[in-house]
Curated annotation (Swiss-Prot):
Protein name per the record: ATP synthase epsilon chain
Superkingdom, natural source: Bacteria
One Gene Ontology cellular component annotation held by this UniProt entry: plasma membrane
Regulation: Increases 2-fold following exposure to low pH.
GO molecular function terms attached to this record: ATP binding; proton-transporting ATP synthase activity, rotational mechanism
Function of the protein: Produces ATP from ADP in the presence of a proton gradient across the membrane.
Subunit structure as annotated in this protein's UniProt entry: F-type ATPases have 2 components, CF(1) - the catalytic core - and CF(0) - the membrane proton channel. CF(1) has five subunits: alpha(3), beta(3), gamma(1), delta(1), epsilon(1). CF(0) has three main subunits: a, b and c.
InterPro entries linked to this entry: ATP_F1_dsu/esu_C_sf, ATP_synth_F1_dsu/esu, ATP_synth_F1_dsu/esu_N, ATP_synth_F1_esu_C, ATPsynth_dsu/esu_N
Record PANTHER family: ATP SYNTHASE DELTA/EPSILON CHAIN, ATP SYNTHASE EPSILON CHAIN, CHLOROPLASTIC
Coiled-coil stretches: none
Annotated localization: Cell membrane
Family stated for the protein in its record: Belongs to the ATPase epsilon chain family.
Amino acid sequence: MADPEKLFKVIVVTPNGMIYSHRGSIVDVRAIDGERSILYNHIPILTPLAISEVKVKRSREMGSRIDHIAISGGYIEFSNNVATIVADSAERARNIDVSRAQAAKERAEKRLREAREKHDERNLERAQVALKRAMNRISVYNARGH
């Protein structure tokens, strides 16, 4: 008989509300200091996250499906077998409008060129962050197999 699968609650929230709430067996995140994989009974943590993809491996009953979520930074807290991700913004791969993300990427690239030409450090940093967010959304959309 197979061992019972150990699942924990995974929640992703933004200022606009809850984006995701399911049970998973593994959550992969990119903290600002590197990759992290969280499993059932992981030690409690609170760590800042980079603009990146969050992967949630669902239960065997769900075919061990992996849910892909684009986040624009934030924090993950894990305690008592609940992973809570609080992000500035988050989007499930299935909800990403890739044409909007591509347009945002092009706008950010234009703003980046203009900021470099004008030696405008403040707008350069903003454009770099906007470009990372757009590229992350496109990458997460493509990771889902589109």
